[in-house]
A protein has these predicted regions:
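N-terminal Rossmann NAD(P)H-binding glycine-rich loop of SDR-like oxidoreductase domains
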Residues: 1-24
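Active-site beta-alpha turn of Rossmann-fold NAD(P)-dependent dehydrogenases/reductases
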Residues: 7, 60, 97-98, 119, ...
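A short beta-strand-loop structural module common to alpha/beta enzyme folds
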Residues: 26-38
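Active-site "gating" loop of Rossmann-like NAD(P)-dependent oxidoreductase/epimerase domains
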Residues: 62-73, 99-120
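Short alpha-helix in the Rossmann-fold core of NAD(P)-dependent oxidoreductases
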Residues: 71-79, 94, 122-126
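Conserved beta-loop-beta element that borders a ligand/cofactor-binding pocket
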Residues: 94, 98-100, 130-142
Length: 142
């Protein structure tokens, strides 16, 4: 299985690479965080089409949530590009989101079935990203 990992230099990327390599069942094709700051859709097309991928694992946004460069509209646009290409090529997509999609106002633990209700800009952007992915893709796991 050929897996494209977006955010290979993230903690999750390092762990995934360390876990998958000894098993030799999966080929990890990694893209570091800085290299995912695409400015044009063409850059994403080249990345996707040059590889014969079985899965896209997107760890970009969960990694940069509390980073120096906050999650914002450029990330939403990049996600649109990725979703469109993954749908066209019929590549399953695994997106790592965050609990930031919830406001934290409930007095009980949140469930997967709870409606995202974030009010902060990062949480709202993550909600928009999840919406873009679920609308564009048949095979999406968030």
């Amino acid at each position: 299985m050929r897996v494209l990992v977006l955010g290979l230099d993230s903690p999750l990327g390092f762990s995934l690479r360390a876990f998958a390599a000894p098993l030799m069942r999966h080929e990890i094709i990694g893209v570091d965080m800085d290299a995912t700051r695409w400015r044009r859709e063409r850059q994403v097309k080249k990345l996707i089409r040059r590889q014969s991928l079985d899965l896209i694992l997107d760890a970009r946004l969960v990694t940069q949530i509390d980073g120096v460069d906050p999650v914002g509209q450029p990330d939403l646009e990049r996600t649109r590009w990725l979703a469109s290409l993954a749908a066209r090529e019929r590549i399953p997509y695994f997106f790592l989101s965050s609990a930031r999609v919830f406001s934290g106002t409930l007095t009980r633990p949140y469930r997967e079935t709870d409606h995202p209700d974030a009010t902060d800009p990062v949480g709202r952007t993550l909600i928009d990203v999840e919406r873009v992915l679920t609308e564009a893709l048949d095979e999406i796991f968030i």
